[in-house]
Regions:
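N-terminal export signals
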Residues: 5-25
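Glycan-recognition and catalytic cores of secretory/periplasmic carbohydrate-active enzymes
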Residues: 25-443
Length: 443
């Protein structure tokens, strides 16, 4: 299907939220909601759930257990290739926070087994030993196996926010309220740093390359994305007015400022005052973050029971996926460097595809919208035919590739095992499918 056809497949469906629920569970229109006979991606819901379980419990988790998890010192040694061969034993503070969240979430929602809680606990204990001393200092980005800094913080707050996300989810798993309090302290620190007018001047290089002009104090869609995800998960555990303000501020920034009415797409970078820059950055649309941010905002609309907001974010999610879709080889591109010139980065990253799968399944679960089913079906077919490496003897999936995601090119990329976006997709979608099955009275 070409992009134009996909954009016009179905008029926007009325998307409402069952006000009594805080998690996605029931579509407003019971005549359209999925039932156990629903077929997605050529499978019944039960068959699809079984596939997701195999991908998670038979492939991903055993590989992590055998090759990546440091059972002695705690944490994750993710610098390894698809066979499990390690490049080194260094660890990343980003991947520690992310990994803690993954295993704590797994324990809380899918498999209440002590071994998973132990992995999460040992990871957070490991990374907390390298906690920075200064109130506004950030975590070292890379650590040795025993926790000594290899590289210092690079000025981005993402790593500390991922640690906060892990702490909060571990607090839920253990009942240790101190972990939640520490997470809030980290969020507050990150907001302070983000609000500085000189925050992260080199941010443009992430999207436009080394020659990108400095952009100190830019407002970054990716930062709002992580802030709202961390804050709203924490608010599911405990009411907190300060975190509510963080969540509302993040939603407002994306909804009313990053959204470009002319493009009907989200700009990644804005001026510090949230005005649109009068230079090349006004043409930058990082579709990967746009898609990822919007499914998170769908969850937030559900949490705050705002039906109209859900509708808006569903429409914008659909628009971003449609524009980013590669009509020739399939999948979505992640980086539209210049809208008017139609200038894209032509690689394919797994995480961006998995964000499409999360968002489209969420919309379909709650509405039964034909366009969401179609989006999920074709993206799932593309992903499953492109990224899994079983044909090469590995249970993991390629984390990135060129436009065609060719295996020989993938092998030339940095050796890394992705321990966050992939299991997050598997877990969130497995939970969504199970909810759909449960509501049909069959399991």
């Amino acid at each position: 299907m070409n992009r134009r056809t996909f954009l016009n497949t179905a008029a926007t469906a009325g998307i409402l939220i069952a006000a009594r629920e805080r998690t996605p569970g029931q579509a407003r229109n019971p005549k359209r909601r999925p039932d156990p006979t629903t077929v997605l991606a050529g499978r019944t819901l039960k068959q699809l759930a079984e596939q997701y379980r195999r991908d998670l419990f038979e492939d991903f988790l055993p590989f992590m257990d055998k090759y990546i998890i440091d059972h002695d010192l705690g944490g994750f040694m993710c610098n390894a290739d698809y066979t499990g061969e390690r490049v080194n034993t260094n660890k990343s503070s980003w991947f520690e926070g992310r990994g803690t969240w993954v295993y704590a979430f797994l324990y809380n929602n899918l498999a209440r087994e002590q071994k998973y809680l132990d992995v999460a606990t040992k990871s957070i204990e490991f990374v907390l030993r390298s906690r920075p001393e200064g109130e506004d200092e950030l975590w070292p980005k890379e650590l040795t196996r025993d926790g000594k800094p290899v590289t210092q913080a690079d000025g981005e707050i993402y790593g500390d926010l991922f640690i906060a996300e892990g702490l909060a989810e571990l607090s839920k798993a253990t009942g240790n309220k101190q972990y939640w309090d520490e997470a809030k302290t980290l969020v507050r620190k990150c907001v302070r740093l983000y609000d500085r007018e000189d925050y992260r001047p080199a941010i443009g290089q992430t999207y436009l390359g080394r020659t990108a002009r400095p952009f100190p104090g830019a407002r970054i869609q990716g930062v709002w994305m992580v802030l709202v995800r961390v804050a709203t998960q924490m608010l599911e555990m405990r009411n907190d007015p300060e975190l509510e303000k963080v969540a509302k501020r993040s939603v407002d920034a994306v909804l009313n400022h990053h959204f470009h009415p002319g493009f009907q797409l989200n700009n990644e970078l804005l001026n510090h005052d949230l005005s649109r820059p009068a230079n090349e950055y006004s043409q930058l649309v990082y579709t990967g973050h746009g898609i990822e941010t919007l499914w998170m905002l769908l969850f937030e609309a559900i949490r705050i029971r705002d039906n109209k907001l859900f509708d808006t974010f569903a429409d914008r999610f659909r628009r971003h996926v449609s524009v980013a879709w590669d009509d020739v080889y399939g999948g979505v591109f992640r980086n539209l460097m210049n809208v008017d010139a139609n200038l894209w980065t032509l690689d394919k990253v797994l995480w961006a595809q998995e964000e499409v799968l999360i968002g489209s399944l969420l919309v379909f679960e709650r509405t039964g919208a034909p366009w969401a089913r179609e989006m999920f079906d074709r993206t799932y077919a593309y992903v499953m035919s492109t990224f899994p490496l079983k044909k090469y003897g590995s249970p993991v999936w390629a984390y990135a590739g060129n436009r065609k995601v060719e295996f020989e090119e993938f092998k030339t990329r940095p050796k890394r095992i992705e321990n966050y976006h992939h299991p997050r997709h598997l877990m969130l979608n497995l939970l969504a499918i199970d909810r759909m099955i449960d509501r049909g009275g069959k399991r």
